[in-house]
């Protein structure tokens, strides 16, 4: 490709074409060589990926061994992508083109200013020429005016008689002619100065180098020059017309010859005067001859003198008129010569300006045509190179899009995997919380049962004491009740400080109590007069305030310990654990019974017992009438303790249930074990009546107390766990196979069909190696490895990943291989961790991520792999400090999953991988909805594609393969 060869590419800016050619010319090479150096040869050629992959040694540990150490593979190195270098070269080329465009814009701006200055000067010259023409016309008008005045004065001279006035008129005429001559001289001087100035400007413009100025002129200069030429031509035509009119006027003035008219007028005037004077003389002579004879001579002499005077006057007038004629002729001749000289100079100057303008226009046009041709050639070449580069970029962008699609699928699988792990954690935490709630309820029930038994024992003991006591004698002494009434009332015992069962024997050993039963009762009037602060009746037991703790409004929870107080009694375990509702109902029944017994038995009791019951106002004040101040406080503390423990357990259960419901992925879907636990204990947790939550806003714990139906997640039922029979079959089959008994193969198949992952993996290895009478069948080996991997065996996951990566026993799929390597790596398999790191490092099956590769190398190195440690050290230099810190933290926080977690994960895997998903993947790929692997495994991309298809078909966009969606997809499958 030469610098001048034409090339044709549409859509290229001429400026960019010219700039590219100019840069190539400055570099001393052709445009193609320059573009090759800038775009392709800038950072050096990269090696062929396939050759690079063949030259690099790999670690493929693919031999099958019997021990538990699975093989590992080495991934070939991948070449780096060249899109970055091409983009960098294009950026540099764009920057250079923009700089050249800036320089061109600056040059064009300067040329524009120069052209504007030239046009301004041309306009000034035109205005000066118009001013000169106007001055010429003014001078001609003044000349015409003066000529009219001279003609008028000559007419007056002719009409008037000869005398002093004629001389004055001639002098005035001479003065006017002098003024006219002065005006003409001044006009000539101004014209000369204007012409000299115009010549100087033209010389100044022509003295510069016009070729240097013309080279920088662009298309707009031609248009403006054409406009200037048009205006100049119009001005020249107007100036020519003005000069032509001036010439006509000067010709008229010249042909008029005012001196000839004056001479003829004077001659006719003289002849007329002569005739008149002759006639007058003859008449006067006749009259004189008639009238006088002596005086005739004197009159004749007088007339002779008069004739002489008249003749002298005529001679002077003739001489003056002749002089005036000569002056006028000279003035006209001089004016004519000067006007002709000015016209010739103006014509030559205008002709010179027109020639210069034409030459400049021709040069500019030539330069512009040459620049257009050069720019067209440069842009054609640049367009060809850009088209080639565009094709390469399109190919690389397509490959990048394909890699991005694979990366998106990988991300979707990772998201699904993370979601699966989160669900497992939620299930574990929910199960733990359910167990804790159950244990808490059991402890609460035991405490309540112990408290109830102790209360019953105390009540029965008090009842026995009341029955054994003698009947009270009639009142004999009045001072005794007064002394009893004036006894100071002890303060009520606080349930948070005293041990509520520390005075268990106070009913029989209390001295105050014995005095109370032995003392005779006082008259009723004494009790009516005595004033006690606590004598007013209180509200019935278990009123609305007593349930404030259950409502969650008690600001301070009990601080006393329960277990140490009840540990000494060791009550028997209840035959059946009571629910929270049963406890509440029994407490209500006890309160109602206490109130009823207090109302009925109060009349039959003594006044002292009645007064004591009124003063106490406690829950158990009506049982036997034996309660003192201290025993009342003990019993109240027991009931309060039971209620507080019950309320705390209920609130804890409600809060945990609400939290579990709110932490699920879907508002209507709960984990299966949580849903079962809630359904099994819904009767125990539900609270009605006063125990319902009365706080505004309905806290989150209320969610667990609602009676709404819990809808489980729409997933298929997980596979049943392997039974002990399958495990026993597997152990028996292994013993027989290792001893050489081929009947163990059938037992192994039965165990594998029973869903035992270890048996499935063992059978897969037998099909792979062809041992013990089993033929080599890689397809069967792959199938059984997949079943074992779905069952949660990490070795099977690693083996299945190798099958997918190498394409043994089925199609090759690096993305699926990376997924199974990831699952095995999560379970702590070192070789899978190493292989997964290699996949992330090379970008096979997953998006290339050096930080993730470094993390898995570090994890494998911590597990004892020295090669992984070396790889991690080599890869550390390629990471930023922040990425390295993040990867190190992730590696330190890594904990391998247990077999229980794997089993839980594998139970959800068969639900996602089924034939229906495979059909959906194939059909949606044909219809253009889905682009990804057709492995029958659910992914976010597949769910989005299914939702889009359902939306287009007018179905609910659930994202799952329901019956209607499967029927419509099956039409395309058939």
UniProtKB/Swiss-Prot annotation:
GO cellular component: membrane
Modifications after synthesis and translation: Two isoforms exist, the full-length translation product PodJL and a C-terminal truncated form PodJS. Both appear during a specific time period of the cell cycle to control different aspects of polar organelle development.
Region (Disordered): 460-497, 589-611
GO BP, sorted A to Z: cell differentiation; cell division
Protein's cellular compartments: Membrane
Bias type Low complexity, positions: 589-598
Residues in coiled coil: 81-163, 218-320, 375-469
UniProt cross-references to InterPro entries, sorted A to Z: Peptidoglycan-bd-like, PGBD-like_sf, PGBDSf, Sel1-like, Sel1_AlgK, TPR-like_helical_dom_sf
Record-annotated membrane-spanning stretches: 642-662
Membrane topology (UniProt): Single-pass membrane protein
Functional note: PodJL provides the positional information for the localization of several polar organelles (pili, adhesive holdfast and chemotactic apparatus) by recruiting structural (CpaE) and regulatory (PleC) proteins to a specific cell pole.
Additional detail: PodJS must be degraded to preserve the asymmetry of the next cell cycle.
Protein name: Localization factor PodJL
Organism: Caulobacter vibrioides (strain NA1000 / CB15N) (Caulobacter crescentus)
